[in-house]
Amino acid sequence: MNAKEFLIELLKFKSVTPNDDGALNFIAMELSDFEAFFIEKEGIKNLLLTKKFKDEGEHLAFGGHVDVVPAGEGWSSDAFVPMEKEGFIYARGAQDMKSGVAAFVDAVKNADFKGARLSLILTSDEEGEAIYGTKAVLEWMQERDMLPDYAVVAEPTCVKKIGDSIKIGRRGSINGKLLIRGKQGHAAYPEKCINPVHDFAPVLKLLAGFDLDPGSAEFSPSKIVITDIRGGMGVCNVTPNDLKLMFNVRNSPDTSLEDVKSYVEKICHGLNYELELKQSSEAFLTNIDNKIVQKMNESVQKITHEVPELNTKGGTSDARYFAKYGVKVVEFGVCNDRIHAIDERVSIEEFEKLCLVFKDLIENF
């Protein structure tokens, strides 16, 4: 089947995370000349497809996920019955990221690769916990001395049109929980209470929106973003016993969890508080002079006639795991204007260009 037909079939699988619903088997059958390793961890199904072309040379990998977020209500048609209309294919996962998977499957089928090994790393655990998927496959590969030299993760990276953006890194993510303790009492007798809202009010303006670093050419500043704040009993005559606050920092490599901890401790000095911090993902950056960045840039410009912005914007992805294992990685895919949305769709023209970009990359790597 051709690339579009393959994408349409792939979109029919109700692979709501972490269930692959048979999508991984379907892909393995399409690439029957590749060695297939089904790697399961904690009930999560992953697939490594790999093919050796020669003994010496470079190992290039493509990474992606077949799991999708739930469809939800309000769709114009069944989210798992792909609908083609006016140059678009509508279905859950059309942009995020079955189009990317279908594109690199088509590319490896049709490209003439001159390197040593091609691999496809696929998971059904990216939209959820994302800890037993790509990470587990890379761990398995490391144990067998099979790690790739370079990787492309086919997440939807483009903003307005195919070719306008390549991700060369990602910010990390640090989650924080702050508990300010007080003493509950009657609002008519504030002198007998310890009101954590009053105590914390001057500190809030030092926390909310604060830039922990100035940013760089590649990364925006590591900003503290308040995501939740609550206290009290929902009544007007009782002061709260404590105040609970949650925040997130999308951090660059210039700001660590320890930096966040140090700043919060400094501004909360004198308060009775508890602080909990967790790094859910780490920042990474692939140098713009690296081969994978240069070759991807060349292929994108050649096929799309766009000059892509090389950036680190957006949330986290499985590319961070490749970077952690020392693999030089970039991300490139279709536009992301409808990801996780009702009536998610992908442009057929964009998808076909993506297939050609990946094919060109493989052949000229």
From Swiss-Prot:
Catalyzed reactions per annotation: N-succinyl-(2S,6S)-2,6-diaminopimelate + H2O = (2S,6S)-2,6-diaminopimelate + succinate
Residues the entry annotates as binding Zn(2+) 2: 96, 127, 340
Enzyme class: hydrolase
GO biological process: diaminopimelate biosynthetic process; L-arginine biosynthetic process; lysine biosynthetic process via diaminopimelate
The protein's name: Succinyl-diaminopimelate desuccinylase
Transmembrane found in the keyword field: no
Catalytic activity, EC: 3.5.1.18
Gene: dapE
Any one GO MF annotation of this record: acetylornithine deacetylase activity
Keywords carried by this UniProt record: Amino-acid biosynthesis, Cobalt, Diaminopimelate biosynthesis, Hydrolase, Lysine biosynthesis, Metal-binding, Zinc
Entry annotated with the keyword Hydrolase: yes
Positions bound to Zn(2+) 1: 65, 96, 155
SUPFAM superfamilies assigned: Bacterial exopeptidase dimerisation domain (SSF55031), Zn-dependent exopeptidases (SSF53187)
Catalytic residues as annotated in Swiss-Prot or TrEMBL: 67, 126 (proton acceptor)
Pathway recorded for this protein: Amino-acid biosynthesis; L-lysine biosynthesis via DAP pathway; LL-2,6-diaminopimelate from (S)-tetrahydrodipicolinate (succinylase route): step 3/3
Family statement: Belongs to the peptidase M20A family. DapE subfamily.
Cofactor note: Binds 2 Zn(2+) or Co(2+) ions per subunit.
Any Pfam family matching the protein: M20_dimer
Cofactor dependence: Zn(2+); Co(2+)
Entry function: Catalyzes the hydrolysis of N-succinyl-L,L-diaminopimelic acid (SDAP), forming succinate and LL-2,6-diaminopimelate (DAP), an intermediate involved in the bacterial biosynthesis of lysine and meso-diaminopimelic acid, an essential component of bacterial cell walls.
Subunit structure: Homodimer.
Family annotation (InterPro entries): ArgE/DapE_CS, Bact_exopeptidase_dim_dom, DapE_proteobac, Peptidase_M20, Peptidase_M20_dimer, Peptidase_M20A
